[in-house]
Amino acid sequence: MSFCLTELHLWSLKSTLHIADRDIGVYQYYDKKDPSVSATEHGNLEEKQRLAESRDYPWTLKNRRPEKLRDSLKELEELMQSSPCVLSKWKSKYICQLLFGSGVLVSLSLSGPQLEKVVIDRSLVGKLISDTISDALLTDSFIILSFLAQNKLCFIQFTKKMDSLDGNKRLEKLSALDLKISYYDIPGPANRTIDRHLAVNSTQDLVVCWWPLVSDDVWPWTPVSSEKDRANMLLLGFTQGGLEVLSFVRTEWSPLDVHFGTKQPYQVFTVECSVSVDKEPMADSCIYESVRNKLHCVSVTRIPLRSKAISCCRNSTEDKLIVGCEDSSVILYEAHRGVTLLAQAELRPSLISCHPSGAILLVGSNQGELQIFDIALSPINIQLLAEDYSPKETLQFKKFFDVSSSLVQMQWMAPPVVFQKPKRGEICDLLFLRFNKGPLGVLLFKLGILTRGQLGLVDLILQYIHYSEVYEAISILRSMDWDTLGQQCLIGMGTIVNHLLRQRLTPEREAQLEASLGTFYAPTRPLLDTTILEYREPVSKYARRLFHHLLRYKRFEKAFLLAVDIGARDLFMDIHYLALDMGELALAEVARRRAHDIDVESVSSGVELLGPLDRRDMLNEGFASSALMPEGENKFPGLLPSIGSTHMQTLQQKIPNGPSSRWAIERRTEEEEEEEEEEEEELCTDSSGATTWNAEGELKEDQRKQDIGDVGSLRMVHFGLV
């Protein structure tokens, strides 16, 4: 079974951590003042120290000038005890910046999972109107601060540019940048302590300031409050070296998250906690657009939930929204397919973080627990490096603390996509962890050399196939979009199909093959014409291999339907000759006639057909519903519909047909079609091994997912073709 192997590195010198000698996957720093280690008193601690030093993990921190790393870390741990951390930002893969409520800015320089340098900057201490900072924005040219109790924003400009040389490693204090500090009033409820959050767009010319709706919406002193005072989302711009409120709106529901789009810098994405007409909890995914410096809501997608949302996260491409709920359920909404997935977590999902590659997502609780799901919400086991193999569903951090400390933040160590494009082949295997009042640390994912340290969608499919977890691999493939990830989809499909074609054909594997090819031939939403033209030839090679695989096991009905979808003359002739050898004369005649029709069509049109002729040219509904085993013996009632019920597209003339559209070259006369359908129906009636698929045409649902169709309108997606 596939699982993630990890190491936990805690950046702490405290003796309150409870790390056993045999915990070779958990590390902390030790002080030189500690008494000498004795093998008889401390068991295997000496061996663990030798193991750490052999891997270039420091056992004790150096205190050389000017860094004085050990003293700086002790000062940082004391600071975390006295002041809350309001912001942590990864300036690059090597530098993390922490801003505390008192105005202290701490920069951490890393080398792998280990601390290399700690710089504590107190340039802002005593220069602000308040030491209760709510949120902050840190860029290379300015800082913006919001406060808990004041309706003001602090705008700090750098009149001197930051040195760009070796920007990934260089740490510079704010005092060297000649700060210019100014304050600006903003609308909103006065005399109230509110968490005012900030976000900036990729072009760094717009800022949004937002806060949750106040529950006790009472406005004293004025009979009618102005719309400006009731607003909870502000759009700000930069004018003449300062900040200006450009627009303000009051959201319909209380927002859970607000940020600018990564690809559309003038769109604002929000997630709002709403309620349906039946008083059922929902999440509204809204898009606001800035038009002439005014915010307008242009899109609202309502997602039904099982309980109130408490956390949310979007993937890097922003086509998937993950919502964590109070009842430990995790909801994933896929925008490109318009479907919703549900999984039940083993913990309360207070924190959610999606890997930059979009392959996995991590769910954490304040109690110090961590669980991993793939992007199709299949759970993945996790284990710390140890002598024994013991992967589990969750990872427990709390057992390493003598004093209880809640997990308040987890973040992948990578710069935001809006500020820096990830380099090709760059490894992202470190998860930053911050516990309340300390310590800080990272969780290192040991991804191995076979994937070259990568954790992408294709890498995850390869891992699933390595452990023969085909359903999980197919669900990953189904979640991928051919229009944007075509090459990765092709590689993933090839991996799954090649694995299945090497094995004996069974009803289950046949359904899995259909599901894999169906991601291209029968997508939930039609693919772009350019996508079909680019990938139909390599995908058809896999379809041809499946066709001959079906013939090898004498699955004539399915092979015929697949040949109809592919629309190639040689496939029908293969059926014709094999059917003659097997004594299936009726099938041989139908296949020969279909091959002849394709010849006629090719001559008349001057091109070789690459797809089916027409929906009415296919076998009738009774023939298309033929199954694998005699009635009463179907042990796979939740398998997929046959490939013959899917649609291929030849991109020449679009003919609407029910919910999907098919492509044809020319229509045949109704008399010819009726005559052939009668023969095919007679052939289907004579087939002794034909039964029907289940009415839903769905692949058996993973037992770890729960069907909530009875409790709401949430749509469940099963593995297989829809």
UniProtKB/Swiss-Prot annotation:
Residues 671-684 have a biased composition (Acidic residues). Keywords: Cell membrane, Cell projection, Cilium, Cilium biogenesis/degradation, Cytoplasm, Cytoskeleton, Membrane, Repeat, WD repeat. Coiled coil: none annotated. Residues 697-708 have a biased composition (Basic and acidic residues). One of its GO terms (cellular component) is plasma membrane. It comes from the Eukaryota. The keyword Repeat applies. GO terms for molecular function: phosphatidylinositol binding. Pfam families: Frtz. Residues 685-694 have a biased composition (Polar residues). One of its GO terms (biological process) is regulation of focal adhesion assembly. WD repeats lie at residues 305-343, 344-383. InterPro entries: Frtz (IPR024511), WD40/YVTN_repeat-like_dom_sf (IPR015943), WD40_repeat_dom_sf (IPR036322). Component of the CPLANE (ciliogenesis and planar polarity effectors) complex, composed of INTU, FUZ and WDPCP. Interacts with CPLANE1. Probable effector of the planar cell polarity signaling pathway which regulates the septin cytoskeleton in both ciliogenesis and collective cell movements. Together with FUZ and WDPCP proposed to function as core component of the CPLANE (ciliogenesis and planar polarity effectors) complex involved in the recruitment of peripheral IFT-A proteins to basal bodies. Binds phosphatidylinositol 3-phosphate with highest affinity, followed by phosphatidylinositol 4-phosphate and phosphatidylinositol 5-phosphate. PANTHER family: HOMOLOC-13, WD REPEAT-CONTAINING AND PLANAR CELL POLARITY EFFECTOR PROTEIN FRITZ HOMOLOG. Belongs to the WD repeat fritz family. This is WD repeat-containing and planar cell polarity effector protein fritz homolog. It comes from Mus musculus (Mouse). The gene is Wdpcp.
